[in-house]
Amino acid sequence: MEELQGYLKIDRSRERDFLYPLLFQEYIYALAHDHGLNKSILYEPMENLGYDKKYSLIIVKRLITRMYQQKHLIIFTNDSNTNFFFGHNKNLDSQMISEGVAVIVELPFSLRLVSSPESKEIDKSMTTLRSIHSIFPFLEDKLLHLNHVLDILIPYPIHLELLVQTLRSWIQDAPFLHLLRFFLYKYHNWNSLITQKTKMILFFSKENQRFFLFLYNFHVYESESIFVFLRKQSYHLRSTSSRAFLDRTHFYRKIEHFLVDFRNDFHTILWLFKDPFIQYFRFQGKSILSSKGTPLLMKKWKYYLVNLWECHFYFWSQPDRIHINQLSNHFIDFLGYLSSVRPTPSAVRSQMLEKSFIIDIVIKKFDTIVPIIPLIGSLAKAKFCNFSGHPISKPAWADSSDSDIIDRFGRICRNLSHYYSGSSKKKSLYRIKYILRLSCARTLARKHKSTVRSFLKRLGSEFLEEFLMEEEQVLSFILPRISYFSKRLYKERIWYFDIIRINDLTNLS
């Protein structure tokens, strides 16, 4: 136990400097603005949202001046309709301050990573970006030998005040924590929305997305910290992760309380973590824990996680947020793919002298398919089709030029083809391409006040093939010796190493 407590001690020499004065620095808002430009969504550039036109250095200077004049600041608790400042751009002021707070609150975590002894190793790993697609070959290698999975939706805190209390162990600036609490109460309705089953990403308003994404990621980080720690103590080995941030675990106060209650059962908990075949992976609020153990062991895992979250982290954990499934008859919904491990029977003929034998064997195969129904729902929300999958025109784009319309549809189609190139069955992907192709034709026909048939007859259907077939042309150029490459392209799974973010339409599903 002394070794355990020594591991949990916080380095008191790394006290955090005051963060509140940074709120009055112009470069903070410039950094937040640049980050917003780089995170524009797939089919709506940031300039179309009007954000770029509203931002200027003069507005930032005026905002900072009003912040110095505290008489213009309205402190409130429950009235969400009350604005921050008196003036004409109240919503813009609120947006800019929240984005500045999001940049500032990330500084202690970034500084801790840079000042750590492992910073050189982290910097080296960051230079080579790891593709999202790289996890699927890993799953194919590991899941073939496992039997059960825990399909977990990470729980939410009972109250947003718990997030502030958790941040106190990282941030020592009391005024800044009060300001953070000020913003949380301004968006107090978010506290009731997060308890629902709908994905968290839908509740992040565009103007405050970074602020809430940071809070949610920090919340997930804390919930996983105890899991990572016990895993290390069980094997006395270092954990590896595709995100170096996960390995920097500091949760002294919570573990100290945890040891009081579980001192006698600590060895039992470590035994639970000594499953040599366990695999854990997560993206956003969805995590998968797979094991070769029995259903009884998986039930113990579920019981342990629920009690840990509710009793020691005060997270909202509902019974239907953790499901125990068997890999052989269940699809794993992860990173926009439906993955499964299916037994494939095959016959092998064996010849021994004059006798031959036919041996029936079963081989496990890892399949990844495109979730067609959620994707059609995403296309319907984006107004490319109705919820039955029937393509419709995009009236909002009808005022653009023909080349701009084709370029937008082409960019969406190429990104979808690029992201779902690892699908085992391409039939669903064909349907998505068909919806986008016909939606593009309907949009152009609407613009020229014509029917789709007459429009395609006049211009020909070849003009739509250019952006739909670009991926095949590029791959044919890379592998020119394969004469039948175009046929193999739609049968083989292709994983790319430049996928650094999940497809936006997948997030909408």
Curated annotation (Swiss-Prot):
Gene Ontology MF terms: RNA binding
Organism: Clematis lasiantha (Pipestem clematis)
Signal sequence bounds: none
PANTHER family: MATURASE K
InterPro entries the UniProt entry points to: Domain_X (IPR024937), Maturase_MatK (IPR002866), Maturase_MatK_N (IPR024942)
A single BP term in Gene Ontology: mRNA processing
Family: Belongs to the intron maturase 2 family. MatK subfamily.
Keyword terms, alphabetized: Chloroplast, mRNA processing, Plastid, RNA-binding, tRNA processing
Name of the protein: Maturase K
TM annotation in the entry: none
Cellular location(s): Plastid, Chloroplast
Function description: Usually encoded in the trnK tRNA gene intron. Probably assists in splicing its own and other chloroplast group II introns.
One Gene Ontology CC term in the entry: chloroplast
